[in-house]
């Protein structure tokens, strides 16, 4: 996942930044490179340490959905195509994924999607206006399954409060993971977080909503009997 988080000692002194992603840039295919060259001027957003004018960016006022870490972008493009009444922004640190997403969006005729290739924490802090998001999506983040790496997980108390600032009142933070231990970690962090309310009728997970497409990876997991956990928490104050 494309994020960094500050680490402080017990006295509150800054120590270092912890990265929650491993940079696996890989090589761009010719198609991805072509998509970046041709479509970035239309759908790409360059990082700048100032708030975006979201109405100007999309040329209209509409609910904004932000996804962190969209991978190759197939699901994000499908969601944007299926919800033309909403504006979508995707953040992904790996340029091959950004190129793939742009190409897929063009093929699908999607015009309500913009992408940013930068660290998500910095984008949230500097570019996303407070109270501007209808939904923030975090699907299948790196689980960092070894105990000594749990501190690298993106869903941490400070980060979910950063997200809360960016959500409108009534806006939702939607998470999904295929690691049960990480799902339990998410539930623990979110249940303790100020200003959020779990939308689950059972106080834990929600069924996969229709708007979140099944990924190929997820379909394979279902066939093998693997679980997937969705959590949706609403900002209430």
Curated annotation (Swiss-Prot):
Involved pathway(s): tRNA modification; N(7)-methylguanine-tRNA biosynthesis
A GO molecular-function descriptor: tRNA (guanine(46)-N7)-methyltransferase activity
EC number(s) reported in the record: 2.1.1.33
Positions that bind S-adenosyl-L-methionine: 67, 92, 119, 142
SUPFAM superfamilies: S-adenosyl-L-methionine-dependent methyltransferases (SSF53335)
CDD domains associated with the record: AdoMet_MTases
Record carries keyword Protein transport: no
Keyword terms: Methyltransferase, S-adenosyl-L-methionine, Transferase, tRNA processing
Function per UniProt: Catalyzes the formation of N(7)-methylguanine at position 46 (m7G46) in tRNA.
PANTHER family xrefs: 3-DEOXY-D-MANNO-OCTULOSONIC-ACID TRANSFERASE/TRNA GUANINE-N 7 - -METHYLTRANSFERASE, PENTACOTRIPEPTIDE-REPEAT REGION OF PRORP DOMAIN-CONTAINING PROTEIN
Protein's UniProt name: tRNA (guanine-N(7)-)-methyltransferase
Organism: Aeromonas hydrophila subsp. hydrophila (strain ATCC 7966 / DSM 30187 / BCRC 13018 / CCUG 14551 / JCM 1027 / KCTC 2358 / NCIMB 9240 / NCTC 8049)
Lineage, opening ranks: Bacteria, Pseudomonadati, Pseudomonadota, Gammaproteobacteria, Aeromonadales
Gene expressing this chain: trmB
């Amino acid at each position: 996942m494309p994020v960094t988080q500050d680490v402080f000692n017990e006295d509150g002194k800054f120590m270092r930044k912890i990265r929650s992603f491993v940079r696996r840039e890989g090589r761009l295919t010719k198609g991805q490179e072509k998509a970046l060259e041709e479509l970035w001027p239309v759908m790409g957003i360059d990082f700048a340490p100032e708030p975006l004018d979201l109405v100007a960016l999309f040329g209209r006022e509409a609910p904004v959905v932000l996804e962190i870490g969209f991978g190759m972008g197939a699901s994000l493009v499908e969601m944007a195509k299926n919800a033309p009444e909403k504006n979508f922004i995707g953040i992904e640190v790996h340029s091959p994924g950004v190129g793939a997403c742009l190409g897929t969006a063009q093929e699908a005729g999607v015009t309500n999607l913009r992408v940013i290739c930068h660290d998500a924490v910095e984008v949230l802090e500097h570019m996303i206006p407070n109270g501007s998001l209808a939904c923030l999506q975090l699907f299948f983040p790196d689980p960092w399954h070894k105990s000594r790496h749990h501190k690298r997980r993106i869903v941490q108390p400070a980060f979910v409060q950063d997200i809360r600032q960016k959500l409108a009142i009534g806006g939702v933070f939607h998470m999904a993971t295929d690691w049960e231990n990480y799902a339990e970690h998410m539930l623990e962090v979110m249940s303790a977080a100020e200003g959020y309310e779990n939308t689950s009728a059972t106080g834990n997970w929600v069924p996969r909503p229709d708007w979140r497409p099944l990924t190929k990876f997820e379909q394979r997991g279902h066939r093998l009997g693997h679980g997937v956990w969705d959590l949706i928490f609403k900002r209430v104050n």
